[in-house]
Amino acid sequence: MIRVLGIETSCDETAASVVALEGDAAPKILSNIVLSQIEEHAAFGGVVPEIAARAHVEALDGIVEAALADSGTTLADIDAIAATAGPGLVGGLIVGLMTAKAIAAAAGKPLIAVNHLEGHALTARLTDGLEFPYLLLLVSGGHTQILAVRGVGDYQRWATTIDDALGEAFDKTAKMLGLPYPGGPNVEKAAQTGNASRFTFPRPMKGSAQPDFSFSGLKTAVRQAATAIEPLGDQDVADICASFQAAVADALADRVSRALARFSQTFPGTKNPALVVAGGVAANHTIKATLERLCAEAGFIFVAPPLKLCTDNAAMIAWAGIERLREGMAQENGFDFVPRSRWPLDSISAPMVGSGRRGAKA
């Protein structure tokens, strides 16, 4: 049996988990502890890196102890320590990776530095036993990407955002409308009573031959609409949220439908092609329904891990560690690994800089 302790501190969740795998049996999440920092950041309308790092320092040792206790294991039972080493907020990454190094050194265990995005990319194999290859749509506060997942450590980025991540667009929209943080669930809640036809917002990149995403123009359109009808009433806010959400769903549908067609052409022999959606934005019911419909039309299986494993967690980091151990891909120099605020899964893909574009989102 392989048991790995995972640690995740890349943003505003302090998390630790123990995941086990025995032979050909399904993997087991023995513990999965996540401490959210929403209350600490709510007053600022977004994550403050310094506050996040200090909160990780205060909480991580207790979270690791709780994960071990809940799993019924001790460090002697653990085969390796896996920790997120990037991408993310560098202060939080330092806290998590240095803690993992200390634990691994003291216990005499291997240290596996894990790419946070790889954790998301491999979660469907933890929850659904999915076989390679498959298509991944990663939609979170920091990333919006489409990747072909061909194997452990083998990823092809087919699309990314050329400006804002989708989760960031949700958060900024919420802030403009006076909705509390986090923006995603509050925009979705307000949209439930809104008229999605009242405002005609742009569908960024729709119809473009370029495969990438863009959300800055949509965010600007929301601000202009809100400014034009100030002061905003509750129904105005609901209508803007519903119209914004509809525009996002349409834009995603256009980008993802192209990716599904490309996947079918690139991997024609795949028996059960699948689209996996991961990241916090994957919790949005309108977006999920849109993607499920697309998959049904294209003959793809739609896979969305449970919400607690879609958002940031340490079980996915522990599982990525297990996957790498099984493939003999654990770093020989894990203790020398330094945190990376930007760390693309597909190192071959060109950075999205130039031609009027802002810097790459990992």
Swiss-Prot record:
UniProt-annotated binding residues for substrate: L138, V139, S140, G141, G142, D171, G184, N284
Reaction(s) the record says it catalyses: L-threonylcarbamoyladenylate + adenosine(37) in tRNA = N(6)-L-threonylcarbamoyladenosine(37) in tRNA + AMP + H(+)
A Pfam family hit: TsaD
Cofactor binding notes: Binds 1 Fe(2+) ion per subunit.
Subcellular location: Cytoplasm
CDD domains documented for this protein: ASKHA_NBD_TsaD_bac
Any one GO cellular component localisation term in the record: cytoplasm
Domain of life: Bacteria
Residues annotated to bind Fe cation: H116, H120, D312
Enzyme class: transferase
Gene3D superfamilies referenced in this protein's UniProt entry, alphabetically: 3.30.420.40
Family designation: Belongs to the KAE1 / TsaD family.
PANTHER family noted in UniProt: TRNA N6-ADENOSINE THREONYLCARBAMOYLTRANSFERASE (PTHR11735), TRNA N6-ADENOSINE THREONYLCARBAMOYLTRANSFERASE, MITOCHONDRIAL (PTHR11735:SF6)
Protein name per UniProt: tRNA N6-adenosine threonylcarbamoyltransferase
Source organism of this protein record: Mesorhizobium japonicum (strain LMG 29417 / CECT 9101 / MAFF 303099) (Mesorhizobium loti (strain MAFF 303099))
Lineage: Bacteria, Pseudomonadati, Pseudomonadota, Alphaproteobacteria, Hyphomicrobiales
Gene name per UniProt: tsaD
